[in-house]
Structures are given as C-alpha cells and as structure tokens.
C-alpha cells in the first residue's frame, strides 16, 4: 500500500487499534469468543480426542500439555486441525539443551494474529507516556533468530503481505553478530529496536558511547523490569515487554504505565490463571479440569499464577504454559485500559532458562557432571542476574578435592560440547554464563538435618529460603 495512503488512514486506524483497550465490560465479548472457538475445535481430531462437542463449556475441557499434541504434530492427518493441513508450518521452539520441540502452526492463524495485534502493538511500543510517536514507515530493528523459529515466520509473513506500515531491518537470516554490527552502523536511522538487554548494555552502548534516541525499545528479557530506568537513560524510552511464544504466538501487549510489564489481548487468546501453589507438571499429557483456575477478570494484584492459554490463532486448548506471571495492576491508567497488567515471574517447570535462549534441566546437568568426571556429593543450580547478564550458578559439594579452576573448566567444556544453544549464547552475548561455588564437605548433610519437612534437595531453582539455609550450613 502506498505510503501516502497509509498516512491518510493512520488517524482512523490509530483510533480503531487503541479504542478497544478502553472497554470496561469486555467479559461478555470474551465469553462469546471462547464459545465460537470451541465450536471450531469440536470439528477437529484434536477436539474429539479432548471430548469437545458443540456446546461444551471451556470449564469442562481438560488442561493440555505438549505431550498431548506431539502425535498430531509428528504424524498429522486431514481433519486433525482447524485449518486445512496445507496451511500449517512446521515450527521449532527451544526444548532443553538444544533439543527443539516441533509445533504445527497455521499461516492463516499467524496472519490473523498479526492483523489484530500488530497496529496496537506498534502504537503502544512508541507511546512515550503522553502520546504515541509512531509515524508511517518507521524503521524497526530486530535481532531475533530467523530460519525455522517463529520470529522468522512472522518476518516472512509481514514482508510478503507488503503491509507498508513499518520498515523492518536487517535481513533476519544474518548472523547475530552481523545484526549487532548493522545496528552500530545504522543506529541513527532506527526508530524502534528489539534486542536483549545484555546486547544493548554490553555490546551496543559501550561502542556508541552516547544516548540513543529511540521511539521504542522492545525486549523479552526479564531484567528489563529491574533495569527500566537505565534502559530509559540509554535509549530515550522505557522498555516495552511482551509475552509471546511459539506455542501461543503473540498474545500480549506492552504496558505503558508499568515498563517491563504486559497485558493479555483478549481478542486473540482466552487466558486463565492457575495459582502458583497449584501449578502443573508439564510432563503430563492432559490434566483434569479444576475449579482452581481464575479468569482474567478474577486475578489479584501481587498474586503469582501459571498461565493457561487457549490462543484463537492455532489449535492449542487450555495449554499449560511453563511460565509463572505476577499480577502487578488491574489497569493501565495511561492508556485507559481496565485489563490486568502482569510481569514475567519465573518458569513453572524445573528448568533454568537464560535470556530465553538456552534451557537446562536436572537430568542434563547430572549427565554433564558425570561425563565431565566430577565426583560430587550433591549440587543445586539456579538462574542469577548480575546487571543485564543472566547466569547459571551451581553450588557443588565434591566427594574428592578438586581445584576450583579445573572444576570450572571441566563443567564449562562439557556444557559447550553438550548444548549448542549454550555455546551460541556465549558467543553471541560475549560472556560465559556459568558460575560455580564450591561448598565445604558436609554442607548438604547439615542442610538436610536442619531442613524442616521432606528431606529433599531441589537441584534446580531451589527456593531463596532453602538456599539461605544451605549457605548457612557450610560449617
């Protein structure tokens, strides 16, 4: 579409794209959307296996996990899905230690999602707290993986459709470092940037050595919430954070009043919330319906929930996401929205996730230590943040003495061999994400003696209370 036409249409589209946020009583529309969606699901193989029939209430549908959909994705048949089978793309998402999971996602659903959220997203990204600064043709820089991952497909769809509202740079097939170099060369021409906080503060800002003048800075890094003031100082705008994934597609939009937070777009997803204490193990196939689920209109500020998502753009129904979110507000006053606002809190499963790039579980860490020749009494590992960098920190008690440098070298070398994502992340972000702290002999024994309740060691993401108890059990 010619730029002049888009410029003429912009005021009308801005009104249309933003006005829905001010609806006060959206519950009736939400209920209608999920009923319509379940009628479509009832006609599919996935729906039949879930027991969904015309008129089935969402409250009666089982909660689902990846293992339920895996047979459909690996051996699809005509009639299994909402859209014709030829409409589906085979998309990869990061699994654990470089072993990706496969999803089938419909091109039509992807495009419908972009049409509903795209302009609202664009206007919110450039909202400076007082006004929207977006102009037709703004240059948007992104440094996210291309190829078979979801971001690459989004880029292909947008460019093929010739939307014309933004100019996207650079080519998504460039390497990570080539994209960084592109930004360093062209940063004065860029209006909106999407990258990790680490890339911004460690690789971009030190080389430019002057504040940027961006209309918007977009990231999925959890550290954006903590470093929001520093990001404002560096980029000229507070960070905008979204929630999206291969499983759900883009289902959330950035809050303006609460930098680093987001709200779920009820036009594209039916979002339910399971209180943290009832969170689910995603190793299951399905989970029976539960009355513990809270609708979006029932969440409470300060409470932490596991997200249960039914995206309208694909075939997942009541999908238990491996993520915990915290409700920080029931509205965003700056944009006049009564939709609850959330921030990303943590993984719901026992995984260590660094920069949403590499994922490591307990069994894999045990294998790494064993194959590295490390004889240990026990260990625990967790994600820690230092400034903009995310690390995996391991606390290890050894059976036999070993020099700390040798231990670090062995474990790090094995991680580099074992996990391509671990190796690539270190190369891209230019730091080593491993930390190790040696614990004195007898630490875990003393810890278990002092610990109340079940005498168990959480090897992944130990609670802060138990970690403090462990640290105080060293002598």
Indicate where each model-derived feature is located.
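Conserved AMP-binding loop of ANL adenylate-forming enzymes
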Residues: 119-162, 168-171
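Short, well-ordered, mixed-charge alpha-helical segments that flank or form enzyme active sites
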Residues: 112, 147-152, 202-203, 250
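Active-site diphosphate/adenylate-binding microenvironment
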Residues: 28-90, 101-114, 119-133
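Conserved helicase ATPase motor motifs in RecA-like P-loop NTPase domains
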Residues: 91-97
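Active-site glycine/GP-rich loop and adjacent strand/helix microenvironment
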Residues: 1-44, 157-475
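Short coil/turn connectors at secondary-structure junctions
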Residues: 100, 135-138, 213-214
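Short small-residue beta-strand/loop micro-motif enriched in glycine and branched aliphatics
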Residues: 99-103, 351-353
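Gly/Ser/Thr-rich beta-alpha loop segments that engage phosphate groups in nucleotides
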Residues: 97-100, 246
């Amino acid at each position: 579409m010619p730029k002049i036409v888009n410029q003429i249409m912009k005021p009308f589209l801005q009104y249309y794209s933003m006005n829905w946020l001010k609806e006060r009583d959206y519950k009736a529309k939400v209920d209608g959307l999920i009923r319509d969606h379940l009628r479509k699901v009832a006609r599919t193989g996935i729906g039949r296996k879930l027991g969904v029939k015309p008129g089935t209430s969402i409250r009666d549908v089982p909660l689902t996990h990846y293992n339920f959909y895996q047979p459909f994705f690996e051996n699809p048949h005509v009639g299994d899905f909402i859209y014709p089978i030829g409409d589906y793309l085979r998309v990869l998402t990061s699994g654990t230690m470089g072993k990706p999971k496969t999803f089938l996602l419909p091109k039509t659903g992807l495009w419908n999602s972009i049409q509903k959220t795209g302009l609202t997203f664009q206007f919110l990204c450039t909202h400076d707290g007082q006004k929207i600064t977006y102009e037709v043709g703004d240059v948007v820089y992104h440094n996210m993986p291309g190829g078979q991952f979801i971001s690459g497909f989004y880029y292909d769809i947008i460019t093929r459709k010739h939307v014309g509202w933004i100019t996207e740079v650079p080519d998504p097939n460039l390497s990570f470092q080539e994209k960084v170099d592109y930004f360093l060369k062209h940063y004065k021409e860029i209006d909106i940037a999407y990258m990790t906080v680490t890339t911004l503060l460690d690789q971009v800002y030190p080389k430019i050595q002057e504040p940027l003048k961006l209309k918007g800075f977009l990231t999925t890094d959890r550290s954006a919430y903590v470093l929001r003031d520093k990001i404002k100082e560096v980029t000229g705008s507070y960070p905008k954070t979204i929630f999206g994934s291969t499983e759900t597609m883009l289902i959330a939009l950035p809050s303006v009043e609460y930098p680093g937070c987001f709200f779920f777009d009820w036009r594209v997803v039916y979002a339910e919330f399971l209180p943290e204490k009832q969170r689910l193990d995603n190793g299951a196939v399905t989970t029976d319906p539960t009355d513990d689920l809270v609708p979006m209109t029932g969440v409470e500020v300060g409470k932490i929930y596991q997200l249960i998502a039914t995206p309208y753009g694909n075939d997942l129904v009541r999908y238990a996401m491996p993520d915990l979110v915290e409700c920080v507000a029931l509205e965003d006053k700056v944009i006049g929205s009564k939709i609850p606002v959330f921030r990303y809190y943590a993984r719901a499963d026992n995984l260590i996730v660094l920069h949403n790039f590499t994922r490591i579980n307990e069994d894999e860490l045990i294998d790494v230590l064993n194959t590295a020749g490390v004889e240990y009494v026990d260990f625990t590992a967790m994600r820690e943040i230092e400034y903009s960098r995310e690390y995996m920190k391991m606390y290890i008690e050894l059976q036999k003495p070993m020099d700390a440098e040798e231990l670090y070298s062995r474990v790090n070398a094995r991680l580099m061999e074992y996990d391509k994502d671990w190796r690539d992340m270190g190369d891209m972000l230019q730091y080593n994400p491993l930390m190790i702290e040696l614990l004195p002999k007898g630490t875990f024994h003393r810890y278990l003696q002092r610990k109340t309740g079940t005498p168990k060691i959480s090897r992944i993401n130990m609670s802060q209370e138990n970690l403090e108890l462990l640290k105080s059990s060293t002598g």
